[in-house]
Amino acid sequence: MTRAKSGKISKNRHKKILKLAKGYRGRANSCFRVAIEKVEKALQYAYRDRRNRKRDFRGLWIQRINAAVREHGLVYSQFMGALKKTEIDIDRKVLAELAVNNSDGFVSIVEKAKAHI
């Protein structure tokens, strides 16, 4: 019985890793041993940062809302508390978008919130 080598399989596996490593510096884009380490680390970073992105955007929205609310004499925490009292259910993403792009709509929300402080 002849020996079955995994030539095609390993070549395809190497090709897949080297394709993912395209654009890396030095031997990381051409040497399989180095490339596999770099690709694995890059995938770990990607996994971690997909979760961190949600955290970062929430912080950005809060900063934008806080800056816009301070122009009207309120603080972020007071504003959010007042929104809860008035039962206005708008999430932070939409509030930040209103604060940046639709200041008239945001001002009307702030005025409604001010009435309940």
UniProtKB/Swiss-Prot annotation:
Keyword rRNA-binding on entry: yes
UniProt xrefs under Gene3D superfamilies: 6.10.160.10, Ribosomal protein L20
Protein name: Large ribosomal subunit protein bL20
CDD domains xref list: Ribosomal_L20
Swiss-Prot/TrEMBL keywords: Ribonucleoprotein, Ribosomal protein, RNA-binding, rRNA-binding
Biological process (GO), any one: ribosomal large subunit assembly
Gene Ontology cellular component annotations, sorted alphabetically: ribonucleoprotein complex; ribosome
Molecular function terms, GO-annotated: rRNA binding; structural constituent of ribosome
